[in-house]
């Protein structure tokens, strides 16, 4: 269905109004035939009056619209997650084999964390109203949320590890140069003596 979520929700509200109208008209019609209100209410679901038939049709339309809304939300969520996953993969593919600057590490992991946080937000938004979702759909959303949350925390840990590793390499390089200069200076002093 190409309708937007707002259009589907508008149709749902109109269908609810139709259900209520047809139900009340059917009850009224059955009561004018001599049924008690309780009998009339019970008879609406299987009666042959035009209002009973319209009521059942509106009920089915309502269920179909709820299915359309659920399908729309699931498809939209899937598309958003897929887009973010593709961006994460592109970012991962552009990651250098070896870091040169701390600012490169910070930039990479800031971008990665932003994309992962966006994934978490998409899952959280999808889980705000699960009343029309199946248990399997809810489980998939919760699993996705858990994976994205774990990946977000791992990105923060990896950023710290990569920064620490680069700083250690830079420190080792500085110590090596200092020792090299110290040896050269000692050789020069020995040559002067």
Task: Give the location of each predicted region.
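Residue positions that define the register of long amphipathic alpha-helical repeats
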Residues: 1-193
